[in-house]
Design a protein with these regions (language model features):
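Acidic, glycine-rich loop-and-strand cores that form catalytic or ligand-binding grooves
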Residues: 92-153
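Short catalytic/ligand-binding loop motif for oxyanion handling, primarily in non-cytosolic enzymes
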Residues: 67-68, 74-76, 81-85, 109-113, ...
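Structural recognition of the beta-strand scaffold that forms the well-ordered cores
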Residues: 67, 74, 100-104, 155-156, ...
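C-terminal accessory segments of extracellular proteins
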Residues: 154-208
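N-terminal leader/signal peptides at the extreme start of proteins
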Residues: 1-17
């Protein structure tokens, strides 16, 4: 005759956690929360910086396509410098294309385009102004572009009225590279004072 299997004891033993096991699990969870939660905002911002760099890379490719189509680089200034990608048909006027022309570090609600559908943002170049994007385009009126050069700044996160990212400014150069400027580095280089935590973009910028 088979001996009865003692399933009841096994079932009872595995029916739940003991108090000690629960306390240990809660302690481990607390440690993980204390370590990970403060890093979540940093991780989110870094993801937005990566997305912004991708936008700038795509814009550069668009501007080189513009040059191939029209035999020159755009002569417009500010946001219009890159808004021509949509207004002149280099890019298809879609929501995805329009969203590439502004920095993901700044909420759309802070811009003049907040109440417009994306397909209307850059369709009419005459309506576009500096409040239509969180990127600052080159001032081609005072600094015209003739050829692509790694020494020329084309587009940057505009930092207007405050930093797009907490400590980071991105600058698209004429050779397609994107420079990452950090406040701490600029302080060490003497570009900013030790207590300055804001980098102005534009003609009055301390960074050349």
């Amino acid at each position: 005759m088979r001996r009865p299997r003692r399933l009841r004891s096994l079932s009872a033993h595995s029916s739940g956690f003991t108090l000690i096991e629960l306390l240990i699990a809660m302690m481990i969870l607390g440690i993980l929360m204390a370590y990970l939660v403060p890093k979540i905002p940093e991780a989110i911002e870094e993801a937005k910086i990566t997305a912004s760099r991708k936008n700038l890379s795509d814009i550069y490719q668009g501007l080189t396509t513009y040059q191939a189509k029209f035999g020159r680089l755009p002569s417009e200034s500010g946001v219009k410098f890159f808004a021509v990608l949509i207004s002149k048909g280099v890019w298809e006027n879609t929501k995805a294309s329009a969203k590439k022309l502004t920095c993901p570090g700044v909420d759309i609600g802070a811009l003049a385009i907040r109440d417009l559908p994306p397909e209307e943002w850059y369709k009419d170049l005459d309506a576009v102004n500096g409040d239509y994007s969180a990127y600052a385009g080159r001032n081609c009126k005072e600094y015209p572009l003739r050829n692509a050069s790694g020494k020329d700044c084309w587009i940057a996160t505009d930092n207007d009225p405050e930093m797009n990212f907490r400590t980071t400014t991105l600058v698209l150069m004429g050779d397609g590279t994107t420079d990452r400027l950090e406040i701490a580095d600029l302080q060490e280089q003497g570009v900013l004072a030790k207590d300055e935590e804001y980098l102005q973009v534009g003609p009055d910028s301390p960074y050349e």
